[in-house]
Swiss-Prot record:
UniProt source species: Borrelia turicatae (strain 91E135)
Record family assignment: Belongs to the OXA1/ALB3/YidC family. Type 1 subfamily.
Cellular component terms per the entry's GO annotation: plasma membrane
Gene Ontology MF term list: membrane insertase activity
UniProt feature coiled coil, ranges: none
Protein name: Membrane protein insertase YidC
Described purpose of this protein according to its UniProt entry: Required for the insertion and/or proper folding and/or complex formation of integral membrane proteins into the membrane. Involved in integration of membrane proteins that insert both dependently and independently of the Sec translocase complex, as well as at least some lipoproteins. Aids folding of multispanning membrane proteins.
Gene that encodes the chain: yidC
Transmembrane parts of this sequence: 10-30, 319-339, 341-361, 407-427, 467-487, 502-522
A Pfam family: 60KD_IMP
Biological process, per Gene Ontology: protein insertion into membrane; protein transport
């Protein structure tokens, strides 16, 4: 088999394993996006709601909303805005995490027909104006009274922010019958999570629900569920984007869970008390990063005393997570020394390439040794071209006599693939790369593509002129040329495509990928070029001896 065919075989095998890995990772480890963007998570009591009630029509709702006031609250990490209509949280901005326009990221987009990031409703009975009272710097209370079936109820919503600037909000609700001697005539209450987390997917254009997915965690597993009804005890439910999420936890949830079209629909809870009712929810609204999420697993690490909530399970673990963890630690060490994530990616890539250099060297040396046998191999191929069995026997004999393994050039390449995928996954999903600048004015955010010019509209499928994809393509071509011992004129059309078409194809595939990922790819290409040059010099010296 010629050297070019062996290289082609290695490329085919690499592409095959790339496809298998992406399929497995997508099926078992990636998020599934729901088909409906309305996020409504309801909690209904376990007896039928069949009593008459007084509903509020749409005109009354609009009138109340128009007369409502907004209450601004600032904490160390949040800009929060409450509305006295419903006592709901209608805006929640993250102070320390900015979008491309350098404004705090908005965790909720409120439309006319929606009432905030999360809210409690007893049918339409609580769509009313609330009074506001600031209990202390961290606790804010909203209160209202309403009439239902000739009985009067007091409804209180109490929000408590973390005293330690944790991305968690405690929501307590209290429903009291003003006449304590009477039982409740209300059998229905619903918790609604309507999270439209902000994404800036195109320059200057804010979008919501992009890359938004729902998940539910129970029985020690992160699940997306199947359509139908099942009885579960979830620890939390939530909505996530690539970098941010809203998760809701409640103690002792023993519920019936109904899911339709991969969208969370209904939870059935236990019956409320006779004359009073209270409940507590914990809402995480912040970065989708284990450093922020895992503190709620131990009660001594958070101001709310929560433990074993396991919010961190919302961050899916890749198939190669065990490789990504040490890589992330190494990258963090580099950042602590030189606080630039772009340089950390470069240094990490160099470290990884040095560690796998023995495999690369072995692969290239095996290929070089096989190339020395080309004259003898061609003689055998010509001599036994009409006898395939004898041809294979003679080729095997030649390999044994020369001490050459024909697969020696392929296996080391395949062994490097897990490292490649682990580094790819780390750079592509690492939260701390969001908003991290490498070269100001050019690469201002490692989590999105670089840009030197913005068109203001789409040209073909692009909105920006980017430099990194061109550098990636050129270095990939140079790497391919240097690693090959076959001249261009001796290549067939299929071989020419694999050698030179693949870098061009990757140029289009990776054009809009995060710049951090392209920096990793370019560093790999440059290191490979230098590495191949060194190996060729080493092999040449061995031949001269």
């Amino acid at each position: 088999m010629s050297q070019s065919k062996r290289i082609l075989r290695a490329i085919y095998l690499s592409l095959f394993f790339i496809g298998i890995f992406m399929l497995v990772d997508d099926v078992f480890f990636s998020r599934k996006s729901p088909s409906v963007m309305e996020r409504e998570i309801g909690f209904n009591l376990d007896r039928d709601f069949d009593v008459e009630h007084h509903s509020i029509d749409e005109n009354d709702t609009l009138s109340l909303s128009a007369n409502s006031k907004e209450i601004g609250v600032e904490t160390g990490i949040y800009y929060a805005t409450f509305s006295t209509f419903g006592g709901n949280l209608v805006s929640l901005k993250l102070k320390d995490h900015l979008n491309l326009e350098r404004n705090p990221t908005e965790m909720v987009k409120v439309n006319m027909d929606r009432e905030g990031l999360f809210y409690i409703t007893f049918d339409n009975l609580t769509k009313s104006l609330f009074s506001y009272d600031k209990i202390n710097d961290y606790t804010h209370e909203f209160k209202t009274k309403f009439e239902y079936n000739d009985k009067y109820y007091e409804y209180i919503k109490r929000y408590t922010f973390s005293s330690k600037d944790e991305y968690l909000i405690k929501l307590e609700i209290f429903l009291n019958n003003v006449d304590a001697n009477d039982n409740f005539d209300i059998d229905f209450y619903k918790f609604v999570l309507s999270s439209d987390i902000e994404n800036l997917s195109e320059r200057g254009k804010l979008q919501y629900n992009n890359y938004l997915s729902q998940s539910i965690y129970y029985d020690t597993k992160l699940r997306y569920g199947k359509d139908g009804l099942s009885v579960i005890k979830p620890k939390w439910v939530g909505s996530s984007t690539k970098y941010f999420e809203v998760l809701v936890s409640k103690e002792n949830m023993n519920v019936e869970f109904k899911q339709e079209n991969k969208v969370l629909k209904t939870f059935v809870l236990n019956k409320i008390g006779d004359t009073s009712f209270s409940d507590t929810f914990y809402i995480y609204a912040g970065p989708r990063d284990n450093g922020y999420l895992d503190i709620f697993n131990e009660n001594n690490l958070n101001s709310f005393g929560l433990s074993n909530v396991e919010f961190g399970m919302s961050v899916e673990k890749s198939l190669l997570y065990f490789i990504q963890v040490p890589m992330q630690l190494i990258m963090q060490i580099f950042y602590d020394v030189i606080p630039n994530w772009g340089l950390s990616i470069i240094f990490l890539t160099i470290v990884v390439r040095i560690l796998i250099f023995p495999l690369t060297f072995k692969s290239f040396r095996a290929t070089a040794e096989l190339s020395k046998l080309q004259p003898k191999m061609k003689e055998i191929q010509v001599k036994f071209k009409n006898d395939p069995k004898r041809l294979n026997e003679e080729m095997g004999k030649l390999y044994r006599e020369e001490g050459v393994n024909p697969l020696g050039g392929c296996l080391p390449i395949l062994l490097q693939l897990p490292v490649f995928f682990a580094l790819y996954g780390l750079v592509n999903n690492f939260f701390l790369l969001r908003g991290a600048s490498f070269i100001p004015g050019w690469i201002d955010d490692l989590s999105i593509g670089d840009s030197i010019y913005y068109f203001g509209y789409k040209v073909f499928v692009w909105t920006d002129i980017r430099i990194l994809p061109f550098i990636m393509m050129i270095t990939q071509l140079l790497s391919t040329i240097i690693s090959s011992n076959v001249s261009f004129k001796n290549l067939g059309s299929q071989q020419k495509f694999l050698y030179f078409g693949m870098p061009i194809m990757f140029f289009f595939i990776l054009y809009d990928m995060p710049s951090g990922l392209l920096i990793y790819w370019i560093t790999t290409n440059i290191f490979t070029i230098l590495q191949q040059y060194y190996i060729k010099m080493n092999v040449s010296e061995r031949r001269n001896r």
